[in-house]
Amino acid sequence: TVFATQNPVEFEGTYPLPEAQRDRFLFKITIDFPEAADEERMLSAYAGGERLHDTIVKSLQPVISAAELGEARKTVASLVRVEPNIIRYIQEIVARTRHDDAVQIGAGPRASLALLEASRAMAALSERSFITPDDVKSLVEPVLAHRVTLSPDAEMEGLALSDLMARIYEQVEVPR
């Protein structure tokens, strides 16, 4: 499992990742700037000679091994069942990204798999043995948004990916 950061494309020296590389990330989560008090603590520590990178790296400790993570994934897969109506729901949501006029490049099958696995993990974290439509819906944007490319017209109109994601899952009938 790899965690990575991506600088905004607007920054000098940064370039957008190709679609095939973006598709390999499970989630895209946007993190905002720190609160004022947190930033002041950071500045105070830095002013006092503390190098934040060194402090952070020294304090990092693994919480689980790669083997344990693999076992946890297997356990989740065995404990959380996936009903056919949830499979259909996920497939229909992802397919909508491929057939929307605002989309230049839609999400592929890897996105469907990612949405299924993330939904399964959400159910397990909620101590349920089944996936709910709300599990799926809550993960649509973090799982799909970075895999979808807006059409130039949609970008010029100022359509936000979050609005597109909401529109897409609202078009799909929720299973009962």
Role assignments for model-derived ranges:
Residues 36, 40-44, 87, 91, ...:
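An amphipathic alpha-helix signature
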Residues 74-79, 88, 97-176:
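C-terminal engagement/docking regions of AAA+ P-loop ATPases
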Residues 36-38, 50-55, 82-88, 97-103:
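Short, structured loop/turn "capping" segments at alpha-beta junctions
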Residues 1-64, 69-79, 120-122:
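Canonical AAA+ ATPase core
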Residues 21, 43-47, 94, 140, ...:
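Hydrophobic aliphatic residues
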Residues 12, 59-60, 85, 109, ...:
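N-proximal short alpha-helices
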